[in-house]
Amino acid sequence: MIVIIDYDTGNTKSISKALDFIGLQNKISSNKTEILQADGVILPGVGAYPEAMQELIRRGLDVTLKEIAVLRKPILGVCLGMQLLLESSNEHVFTRGLGLIPGYAEKLPDEPKFVIPHMGWNQLENKRITPLTKKVDGEYVYYVHSYYANCPPEYIIATSGYSVEIPGMINNGHIYGAQFHPEKSGQIGLEILKGFKEVIRSCKSSLQ
């Protein structure tokens, strides 16, 4: 069972439908017990970083997510959810994140040829083979964002070109992030979610 974390900041229903489509049992929940009992967790997110982080803290879900990480259960952050996995963001004001992946979120450079927000389809380049990235090289995925993850290169597993090289996917052990929306990215998005399913299966086996 995957729990999609509900904190009133995210596209939970579309992620749930995508998981249903690939036959992955899931539930949308903010209940801490249900989250801790899950085999894996997806942290969605749209909107502004400070408000999203504040809402996680208000509900105590920041602590729950860190407990999930300690339990070595897989986590996938999507869009803003990926940025929340980082150490901090400078969106509007400096805000500490969950600190589960090294790096911070900063605004995309404002250059005449590149519109902000970065919205639409962009091509992925695979930087490291993982269960989530094994089929992504050269594929197009759907982005909507104005901030990006500034991470050490060893945590970046796929990128897209824009005004900077955007980390499209990041990874730290059993914790993954996708800056784009897998649930809106057609067949390749489903393949990425299948890869997360593979990670869950592997982690579950190693913990038994």
Curated annotation (Swiss-Prot):
Location of this chain's protein in the cell: Cytoplasm
Organism, scientific name: Listeria welshimeri serovar 6b (strain ATCC 35897 / DSM 20650 / CCUG 15529 / CIP 8149 / NCTC 11857 / SLCC 5334 / V8)
Function: IGPS catalyzes the conversion of PRFAR and glutamine to IGP, AICAR and glutamate. The HisH subunit catalyzes the hydrolysis of glutamine to glutamate and ammonia as part of the synthesis of IGP and AICAR. The resulting ammonia molecule is channeled to the active site of HisF.
Coiled coil: none
Record's catalysed reaction(s): 5-[(5-phospho-1-deoxy-D-ribulos-1-ylimino)methylamino]-1-(5-phospho-beta-D-ribosyl)imidazole-4-carboxamide + L-glutamine = D-erythro-1-(imidazol-4-yl)glycerol 3-phosphate + 5-amino-1-(5-phospho-beta-D-ribosyl)imidazole-4-carboxamide + L-glutamate + H(+); L-glutamine + H2O = L-glutamate + NH4(+)
Keyword terms, alphabetized: Amino-acid biosynthesis, Cytoplasm, Glutamine amidotransferase, Histidine biosynthesis, Hydrolase, Lyase
HAMAP family reported for this sequence: HisH
Pfam families noted in UniProt: GATase
SUPFAM superfamilies linked to this entry: Class I glutamine amidotransferase-like
Assembly with partners or alone: Heterodimer of HisH and HisF.
Record-level Gene Ontology MF annotations: glutaminase activity; imidazoleglycerol-phosphate synthase activity; lyase activity
EC number per UniProt: 4.3.2.10, 3.5.1.2
Protein name: Imidazole glycerol phosphate synthase subunit HisH
